[in-house]
Structures are given as structure tokens and as C-alpha cells.
Amino acid sequence: VTTTQSELAALIDEYLQLVFAADPIEATQLGIHDYDSTLGDYSAEAYTEQIAKRQVFLSRLQAIDTDKLDADARMDHQLALIDVRTALRRLQDRAIWMCAPYWYVEQLGVAFSALMRDDGQSPATQAERLWARLRLAPSYLETVKSNLTSITAPLHVEMALTAIKGLRNFLASAIPGFAAQLEETLQNDLAHATAGVQQALDEFERFLHEFHDHATGSFACGPEHFDYLLKHYHLLDLDHRQLRDFGLAQMAEDKAAQ
């Protein structure tokens, strides 16, 4: 293993620590349990800090001499670049955190459900971590209110309202079902925390109904961003027009073959 490859491996490990600390929910989904008791910091200040840190990692990755890497390391380097660049694109150009209320609601559902699956941890351990996340949910939703701006698309507000209904049903059924295997104290803790989340969702729903009239953005990402994803994320040598033409040609072939 060359020094350059060792440096790359250490840099990627450092970057992953940043990613998981910034997104504990994703970490839990991947089986990394160091952050299970948190939801993460979704404040505007935290996003600004994330952008700055990712820009530093991008510069450090670009400074790696890929000629000194073997094939596997070059692939790791390419994947790391794709992840950093795409993350920066979402945070800066698309500003998803300022205009996707549905995503925030969906994140909560994932944050809770990921701690109730069978992954080798004891139910009591999972319950303690679930309880911690449930108690953090009301402040999380308050932060979301502060983040959302008029660039939000009305459709995305409507999607969030629909997502709230689904999350309510999940809280009312899945969590009591999971808690049934626990001792009574933990059952009561989860029930009390769940009630707090339900109340916070009621308040967030009222906020979204009022916010809807102020949401004037478009749900479309635009051709430039779409082309960026095709080229730099999906690694396709096609722009949106060429992809459309390819799809139409395939449909015509399929129809002719029927």
C-alpha cells in the first residue's frame, strides 16, 4: 500500500465520520450505531458549517495524485468525489434543506423505524435510543419551521402534509407494537414521548397550512441540475434531451415488438 493510498483511506474515513455525524439517521440505516440517540443538527448554522467542511474535503480529495493509486483506490477516490460534489450541489445550489418539508417528515419516520428492526441489538437498547429520538422530534420540527423559505414549492408542502398522516399512523401502530415486548417502564416512556411527537406534528401541520400560501417555488430541478446529475452522479454521457430521445426510441421499439 502506497503512502498516497494510505492518505486516501484515512481521508475517506475522516469524511465518513463527518457524514455520519451530520446525518445520524443515515448512519443508523447503514448499521452504524454511534449516533442512534440523536437526530442531528439541522439548523442553518449547521448546514453552513457542513458546506464549509465538505468544500475542504473536496479540495483535499482533488489534491490526491491518482496516478499513484491502484485500480480499487482510484474507484474509491472517484466515488468519494461524486459523493462530496453531489452533497455540495444539494446543499448549495438546490438548498434542499430550505425547501423540502416532506423530506424532513420522512426523515423522522426513518429515524424511528430504523431503530425497531432486528439487527442484533437488544430490544431494550433499541428502545432507549428510540426514546431519545422521540424526545428530540419536537425541537427538530421547530428547527424545520425556521429553515423553510418561500423557495419551497406548494407541491412539496402538500407532500409534507400527506407524509404527516403516514407518520401519525406509524406512531400510533408501529411503536406500541414494538413496545409490547418491553418492560412496563420503557413502554410508558415510549408512549409519553410518542404523544409529544404527535402533538408536535399537529403544530407542524398547522404551520404548513399557513405556510402554503407563502411557498412560491418550483418543484422542478431544472435542466442544468438534471444534466449535472446525469453526468457526475450517474456517470452517463447523455444530457436530458438525449435521455428523453433514448427513452422514446426504446418505447417505440417495445411497442413495435408487441
Segments from the language model and where they lie:
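N-terminal maturation segment of proteins
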Residues: V1-Q258
